[in-house]
Amino acid sequence: MTNSIARIGRTYRFESAHFLPKVPDGHKCRNLHGHNYRIDIVVRGALDARGFVKDFSEIDALVAPLLLQLDHRLLNEVEGLENPTAEIIARWFLERIADCESVRVYENDECWAEVSR
């Protein structure tokens, strides 16, 4: 067996409101609005004795408490998300999930941001 590295991903969803305080007056995102966010979490590593990088339930256990902080909340009130752009939300997740290689945050079907290590 080779020492290969594998990547796995899991998708989550949450709904939140936010506004972007650092955009100019008149910009539509300066106003309070909401999104049905989708996030893709990618984890990488060597396969363990079970043949997993991680069991998906292990990723769920890491992500669930983070989603509880964001779901149906005003993101601007969450520490680290005072200016909650999609890029900053992705970074917020990346910094809090062990072994995470990348996080992609979708604000809608057409717009996303990705942050990686």
Located regions from the model:
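Charge-rich, low-complexity N-terminal segments
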Residues: 1-117
